[in-house]
Design a protein with these regions (language model features):
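Active-site and adjacent substrate-binding regions of carbohydrate-active enzymes
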Residues: 1-155, 159-632
Length: 632
């Protein structure tokens, strides 16, 4: 593995809408990010990823882009983004933006032109099909029902990398009105069937969108034309089989990199390659549909697109890129993040998808400490020296890490001091595994999930669909609400808690999403003044990883699990020539005596600093959630 400039850096994700509002409209903005750059610099952050700020109707919070070359006025202007890039450069910081190119907005000019002329140039920018009604068909296949496919799609097939099903969604396309309608339709290893729209059109395939319902929606202004959307119906998929689409995308990427952007986080990128021609799979719910993940399991060939994109855009600019890739196979890692990989890095989602169920959020299993450890260690063993993984405990699509990876029963039964200790323990065990550590806004102060009182408080479209799915399956409203409270994306999107002032100091107006009521107890202003706080501990984590005496071991040293057979112990060794560092966490409430692999030379970090510590040459006694970083 070649050493890269970013290996020793600290990365931070900003969800702009919820970070800091400067104009009182209740929405975070680019001037707010500029104002807080010194805060991020003081924390120790080097790389800042902004979730989308492009012009957008915000149907999916900016992941539906209507103009890739402009900033949405709710966030600011192009002058603001240029000023942000300039101010970041002054501080030796790097700005990374979201790259969302599996789909665009249905309000993008390309899609409007496709609607005006489905058989014209821009109709080929998307997956459009002229369909026939079931009543018109007596024999044939779904492909025949769908009409002719374009030449560019005939040889298509999506990537070997499987993206995990993200349960939940809006259910706004065809709802439950789907019916198994026409005989002699091919299915995946099962009985032949087809699914139809409510008005009887036979759909080309029975894939379920990430946001619920079928992936096919009627093209505006047309009776028998439909378009594909694997996410929300306002996010039509771009046809990557069309070289003209790829050229448009590469031109846009290079335009941003030439403007001074350091790189991109690449959104949902495995979805760009579809399994073509369209066909059904065995349904996995009563709606007659199957998860998109099933299609991605079968698909192959995405690497051709990713390699071309790398060579045409990222590589000439030496850009930093991190991919959103789910459930990749070990043999694919060199192609993705090796020395000439498609991306600089990619996120480890193994723990975020653990226990997820296709049946609905109420069926998701809670991840326990030993499960979390297994996910963490399996990824480290799999990646090894192939490349540099990006490590997270939360992001804008996930619940808060401290509410997920610290057992809820522990959080509820512990006093405030021990909860702080547990939050520091979680921070430590993920921070020093091999790879690039990412901090999501609010994580550094231990922000927690929002305590839902009503479904009316929920904004997230995935959560709202999950609610409908659960109620249709007979789940009580109370149980459904608790499932959303555990799994919903709004948990990460509540405004940053800057202070105990009104609206947590986020805005002088009315916040677009409610502030977590615990902001009077959990906020930056209080923690910055408290040396024992979660925030001050994160500063210590960052300082240790950057310490010249230890950074080579913590960045490039080998990773060796320790005490893997001990339940509720998360421990590992980082080794380099002449130096060994042990991370040792008693990840439970009870005091334990744990063996040491060698005598301790120095305590580098202690999440209970100031408390007595019993250490011998061969053992250490750790109280509940006490966690140490030791030089041996």
């Amino acid at each position: 593995m070649e050493k890269q400039w970013w290996h020793g850096k600290i990365a931070y994700q900003i969800y702009p809408k919820s970070f800091f509002d400067t104009n009182g409209d209740g929405i975070g903005d680019l001037p707010g990010i500029i104002e807080k750059l010194d805060y991020l610099k003081d924390l120790g952050v080097d790389i800042v990823w902004l979730s989308p700020v492009y012009r957008s109707p915000l149907a999916d919070q900016g992941y539906d882009i209507s103009d890739y070359y402009d900033i949405d006025p709710r966030f600011g202007t192009m002058d603001d983004i240029d000023r942000l890039l300039a101010e970041a450069k002054k501080r030796d910081m790097y700005i990374v933006m979201d790259l969302v190119v599996n789909h665009c907005s249905d309000e993008h000019e390309w899609f409007k032109k496709a609607c005006a002329d489905p058989e014209g140039k821009y109709g080929q920018y998307f997956y459009l099909r002229k369909l026939r009604k079931a009543a018109e068909l007596k024999t044939g296949t779904n492909s025949e029902a769908a009409g002719e496919v374009s030449e560019s799609e005939k040889d298509g097939a999506a990537g070997d990398v499987k993206e995990s099903e993200k349960d939940g969604a809006a259910g706004e396309s065809f709802g439950t009105a789907l019916t198994a309608a026409v005989e002699n339709r091919t299915a995946d290893g099962g009985e032949a069937f087809a699914v139809c729209s409510p008005d009887g059109y036979v759909l080309p395939c029975n894939w379920r969108s990430y946001f619920g319902g079928p992936v096919w929606e009627k093209l505006p202004g047309h009776e028998d034309w439909f378009y594909l959307h694997v996410f929300h119906k306002k996010q039509p998929d771009l046809n990557w089989e069309n070289p003209g689409v790829r050229e448009e995308i590469y031109t846009m990427i290079n335009w941003w990199l030439d403007r001074g952007l350091a790189g991109f986080r690449i959104d949902a990128i495995i979805n760009i390659k579809k399994a073509l021609p369209f066909h059904n799979y065995a349904p996995d719910r009563a709606d007659g549909l199957c998860t998109i993940g099933r299609m991605l399991q079968e698909a192959s060939g995405v690497g051709e697109f990713l390699g071309e994109m790398r060579d045409r855009t990222f590589k000439p600019h030496q850009a930093f890129t991190v991919g959103e890739v789910f459930n990749e196979k070990a043999e694919e890692l060199p192609a993705f993040i090796g020395d000439n990989g498609y991306f600089s890095s990619m996120f480890d989602f193994s723990e975020t998808v653990w226990g997820n169920s296709h049946a609905g959020w109420h069926k998701n299993k809670s991840i326990m400490p030993d499960d979390y450890r297994q996910c963490l260690f399996d990824t480290q063993k799999k990646v090894s020296d192939i490349g540099f993984i990006s490590n997270i405990i939360e992001n804008h699509d996930e619940p808060r890490g401290v509410s997920r990876y610290i057992p809820p029963q522990d959080m509820q039964s512990m006093d405030e001091q021990m909860r702080v200790t547990a939050k520091k323990a979680l921070a430590t065990v993920y921070f020093f595994v091999k790879g690039l550590p990412w901090i999501y806004q609010g994580q550094e102060i231990g922000m927690e999930n929002y305590p839902l009182q009503s479904i009316d408080e929920v904004d997230d479209i995935a959560s709202l669909d999950a609610w409908n799915v659960m109620l249709r399956q007979g789940v009580s409203e109370e149980d459904a609400l608790r499932a959303i409270e555990r799994n919903g994306r709004d948990n990460a999107r509540t405004p940053f808690q800057w202070s105990a002032a009104a609206n947590a100091g986020f805005t002088a107006g009315s916040p677009w999403l409610q502030v977590n009521p615990n902001y009077t107890k959990i906020n930056l202003e209080q923690q910055a003044a408290d040396p024992s706080s979660v925030f001050c501990y994160y500063k210590k984590l960052i300082a240790l990883r950057k310490n010249p005496q230890y950074c080579q071991t913590l960045i490039y040293g080998s990773f060796d699990p320790y005490l893997e057979d001990r339940s509720r112990v998360i421990s590992y060794l980082r080794r380099s020539s002449g130096q060994t560092i042990l991370v040792l966490s008693n990840y439970g409430k009870e005091t334990r005596i744990l063996p040491l692999p060698a005598p301790v030379k120095k305590i580098l970090l202690d999440n209970c600093e100031g408390n007595d510590l019993s250490v011998t040459n061969s053992t250490v006694t750790l109280s509940g959630y006490r966690t140490l970083v030791l030089e041996l």
